[in-house]
């Protein structure tokens, strides 16, 4: 099947989806309705571009016809030639865009994410850097119009982040932030360093797609849920009513503790969101590890401990080691202006996928 047959098949399926989504039987089936809605949303951009491409093809045909019929009218002929030139350039652009749009899509790209950041090697300095990363992602989310909600956080004695869990919601969040998982290294002079020596510390980032209950159902028998009193600074109990929730997925040992909210039900709901994402991610990671050979063509190895990026403060430099990108814009990037880095990662990933399809 050539590219045009593929595109026509996508458009035909898109129109079929529109009819299915107005079918009362489909509307009443929540799981199927969500699956079809997601499929329609995932193909919408491709169909829109394909329809615009067909209009450009028609414009080229009309312009060529106009040139034939314009004998004796130099002004009309010149206008038609200019339109033909512009349309041919647009045709080439659409063909490149459509090739990329036809690449196999990550089914998680349109999802919200659970973001986890932890201070790793480097003690207090690592925790402070984890806080810097949290601020960077919060500010980037603002530029994208996303909602950023801290669900759980643990702060150390110097105000750094030992661990933070956040939900980032909005349009195509996972598609842009999925490349952030891995070890982020910082090189800078700590505030406590009296001799001006540069120290190296590390924070780790984990990005997981939000998993809806209809997509991944955890058997209640596999969960152990403990209710306890939330604790404040110094460990004292801050609530007379037990509202904090500890949730353990028994088969994997994955544990979530939640006490940010004032009610037990809200803490339970948030804990369930996180544990569902972590358990689904755990099994997805196992499946991906079994397909290592296929994943070498994409950005990085997928190893969660892989050092993906270095932030060098003395040189105001950020280096992404996976794609060899170096930018002397550390201050700009940490202020949330991450587009240049993320766009480069997306382009690299798409290029590698195109190459693998052509080989």
From Swiss-Prot:
Methylated by PrmC. Methylation increases the termination efficiency of RF1. InterPro entries: PCRF, Pep_chain_release_fac_I, Pep_chain_release_fac_I_sf, Prokaryotic/Mito_RF, RF-1. Its main location: cytoplasm. SUPFAM superfamilies: Release factor (SSF75620). SMART domains: PCRF (SM00937). The keyword DNA-binding does not apply. The modification N5-methylglutamine is found at residue 236. Disulfide bonds: none annotated. Keywords: Cytoplasm, Methylation, Protein biosynthesis. It is found in: Cytoplasm. GO terms for cellular component: cytoplasm. GO terms for molecular function: translation release factor activity, codon specific. It holds the Pfam family RF-1. It comes from the Bacteria. Belongs to the prokaryotic/mitochondrial release factor family. PANTHER family: LD18447P. Peptide chain release factor 1 directs the termination of translation in response to the peptide chain termination codons UAG and UAA. This is Peptide chain release factor 1. It comes from Streptococcus pyogenes serotype M3 (strain ATCC BAA-595 / MGAS315).
